[in-house]
Amino acid sequence: SADGKPADIYRVVADKVTGKLRDLLCTGGIVTKVTTNSKGVKKEEPYYDEKDMARKWLELGLDRKATKRQVMVLPYGGTQQSCREYTEEYLKDRLAGGAENPWGDDTFTPSVFLSRLIWDAIGETVIAARDAMAFLQKLARIAASEELPVNWRTPAGMPVLQAYPDHKARRVKTKLGDSIMYLTLQEELETLSKSRQASGISPNFVHSLDAAALQLTIHNALKEGVCEFAMVHDSYGVPAQDAAIMAKCLRRVFVEMFRDHDVLAEFRQAISDLVSEDKQKKLPPLPPVGDLNINLVLESDFFFA
């Protein structure tokens, strides 16, 4: 950050959520939900009181862990549903640590309430990541509409193919001893799953860039004389005497990757080369580019932990 200290985006989002909770103490109302009875009759009924929810969450208090996983997984395809699930897990962890549940035995409803605020706060903070995710999903959907798998090359030159097939449930009757059993098997079809192609592209694309960074960092470090590595995804390990060399190499590789490659433009071109001329006209434009000076990464003490 500008003051020379590690920037904590999880804390930033948590603070925004706390601000929203304080606002709701004055402006909150009754949130309703629609239920359907056994006869198919729909009925609107009260779900929760926003003022009461806000007061209890403020009394419980939010730390950076309240938003950490929700923010962390966003570039990997995080959704509102996963946001709610992680919020409930956070609440359960707090309760397991000795906190008293202001809602009795209920952890679902308060997680629904808070996750909506967290999701909005993430959207106000991590704007570019959400735009990029939507861009990738649109491209994957267009390719899938022509039954085309998505393929691209990473900055390290590695080819990547994403092809999630549709499935059909097949029920099998079998006998085990004296019992008749029915098993359901998922049979792969020749058609592509459009929903899985879209939902999978964001995490797979980001993981492919992580893999490229790891590959290029090892290649770079080998040229600097480092020959022992313990590498898992985005966790880089070398002998202590080589740590300073590794720190320089991984920063240099990151800068070169994103200085020499417009990864979103390259991905868009890869899709354009696959689809028909008619679909090419429907490809979304590139998301706007920010003003980050990528070379500043070389001077960042806290870029990589």
Residue map of PLM features:
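Conserved catalytic core of nucleotide polymerization and phosphodiester-bond processing enzymes
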Residues: 1-305
